[in-house]
Amino acid sequence: MKIRVGSRESKLAVKQSEIVIEAIRKYDPNIEIELVTMKTTGDIKLDQTLDKIGGKGLFIKELDQALYDDRVDITVHSFKDMPMAIDEYLPIVAVSKREDPRDVLVLPKTVKEPDFSKPIGCSSFRRKIQLQEIYPHCSVEPIRGNVLTRLEKLDRGEFSAITLALAGLKRLGLEERISRIFEVTEILPAACQGVIVVQARKGFDVSFLSDFHDKEAWDISMAERSFVRTLNGGCSSPVAAYGEIKDNYLTLTGLYVDSSNSVHKKTITGARKQGEEMGFNLALQMKGEDEVHGKD
């Protein structure tokens, strides 16, 4: 049996694919595996922010096509990069255990303390709006490119600091670059941040992923995505969600930024099995409160 694994060609994407490949080999060492890497539109168009050029789907478009063309059997993505609408013929078939979902501040290699004379580089409005509450006197500007490209821009002196996902730096073995870890109470992570997701063609036998799939990460991710979807959150939308499970209860925190850039945050707790419904209801509550306040 041979499995062809499709991946973006960035170092982090390949590392995440290798995590999936390792799980498949652990399940059955006799399975032959081929890693097929490719550039996506999102990797090529780096001169504009994602919301200006089509959103998160730009990171999966070419990989989806490779699945349709039978050039690969499964594809691997960061779940936070997945659009809300998933092709019914290319379903999500497994998710990884969640890596640390927090965001971090990274300084240039030779710098110990930030001076903020230059902007903080930031890839999303979600991070930007929360960073501005922590560093109100600092400028926050967009930065694009994969993790290593962003670090190069930082070390060249284009920014005083940049924000990244801790999970990516950890998977790349670059934890020493971290200057500050933001708690989820300071910067609420993107929905599904830290989770690796696998897609396949509908009906394709993915029993080799049975040990890889993490049910807790799945339940949390479904609740977080339900919240974002209900608020029509795209790649750079000022929307975030973070869930935790304890004793079969899910605690879900949502963040929503209204049209006047006011930040709304709310937390609810409910039964784990009702996660998607919780995400939907939390979004409606926050949207309703915003509309009520807007009429005052």
From Swiss-Prot:
Principal EC category: transferase
A Gene Ontology molecular function term of the record: hydroxymethylbilane synthase activity
CDD domains for this protein: PBP2_PBGD_2
GO CC annotation: cytoplasm
Keywords for this protein: Porphyrin biosynthesis, Transferase
Domain of life the protein comes from: Bacteria
Gene3D superfamilies noted in UniProt: Periplasmic binding protein-like II (3.40.190.10), Porphobilinogen deaminase, C-terminal domain (3.30.160.40)
Pathway listed: Porphyrin-containing compound metabolism; protoporphyrin-IX biosynthesis; coproporphyrinogen-III from 5-aminolevulinate: step 2/4
Cofactor note: Binds 1 dipyrromethane group covalently.
GO BP of this protein: protoporphyrinogen IX biosynthetic process
Enzyme Commission identifier(s): 2.5.1.61
Location of S-(dipyrrolylmethanemethyl)cysteine modifications: C235
Catalytic activity, reaction form: 4 porphobilinogen + H2O = hydroxymethylbilane + 4 NH4(+)
PROSITE patterns (UniProt xref): PORPHOBILINOGEN_DEAM (PS00533)
InterPro entries given in the database record: HemC, Porphobilin_deaminase_cofac_BS, Porphobilin_deaminase_N, Porphobilinogen_deaminase_C, Porphobilinogen_deaminase_C_sf
Cofactor: dipyrromethane
HAMAP family for the chain: Porphobil_deam
Subunit structure comment from the entry: Monomer.
Function: Tetrapolymerization of the monopyrrole PBG into the hydroxymethylbilane pre-uroporphyrinogen in several discrete steps.
Family: Belongs to the HMBS family.
PANTHER family: PORPHOBILINOGEN DEAMINASE (PTHR11557:SF0)
Additional record remark: The porphobilinogen subunits are added to the dipyrromethane group.
Protein name: Porphobilinogen deaminase
Taxonomic source organism: Alkaliphilus oremlandii (strain OhILAs) (Clostridium oremlandii (strain OhILAs))
